[in-house]
Amino acid sequence: MKLLTSLIITIALAAPLLAQTPTVAEAQAKQELNEAARAYREGKFADAQAHSERALQLDPQNKTAPMFVARTIHAQYKPGDFTPENIAKAREAIIAYQAILSRSPADDEAYKAVAYLYGAIKEDELLREWVFQRAGNVSIDNAKRAEAYTVLASRDWDCSFKITELPAHKVTTVKGDKASVSYRMPKAQAEFERAKECANRGLEMANMAIALTPEAESAWAYKTNILLELAKLAEMSGDVQYKHELQRQYEEALNETTKVANRSKPKP
């Protein structure tokens, strides 16, 4: 439904531009896009794709046809279906969205659609590379780059958290009406190293986001949570001094997160 709404909006925005085109090819492209929209509304996504591609062939400089192509392919992808045919359709949509970005690098819809599709087909490494590429793109404004770094930080936090919070690693001791939590080293050293790698990398990503947008509440929140992860890992390794230092940094980050959150609240 969201894709359909976006497609209809695109048609509406394109109509004045297309109406001004004098050439036969451009007029034919307009008709093909109208047919694509009609087929899309009827749920005939493959037909919509064919019309969209024909429009692009007729008018390669058309500014809206590439998005028609990408959306109509995307609409044929079925979330949760991991058959080779469906995965291939997702990859086809990714290529179409990337073609848009080659012409318009700042196109948010195309960027987010690629990220969504990589995540949907479980291509975690490609997703990370995609988001990291966005984060490092100096032609994109700082807020969008910071958002990308924050997404990476969130994934790294999740990677560590899923390991440190496992029942075998997190021990809760109850004495009377008080409970204390401690963390023990995983039996598999590789698990510990994986969590440590994720947490350290996540802290770097959060700091990059904050450097670009110092008032980004979500970036500060992830920095705070990642420092807590690093403190857990220091406890697991028996490094008491480093754990105390990380807890100090955690408290500082938590305090700053609260300040940023308060500053972002609308004034009465």
Model-derived features with residue positions:
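Bacterial N-terminal signal peptides
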Residues: S6-P16
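Cleaved targeting-peptide boundary
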Residues: Q20-Q28
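Short coil turns that delineate tetratricopeptide repeat
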Residues: E26, P60, P105, S139-A143, ...
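Alpha-helical segment of the N-proximal tetratricopeptide repeat
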Residues: A27-R54, L58, P79-F82, K187-R194
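Short coil/linker segments at helix-helix boundaries
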Residues: A46, I73-A99, E125, D141, ...
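Canonical positions in the second alpha-helix
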Residues: A55, A99-I100, Q133-A135, A209
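Canonical tetratricopeptide repeat
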Residues: F68-V69, A113, V151, Y222
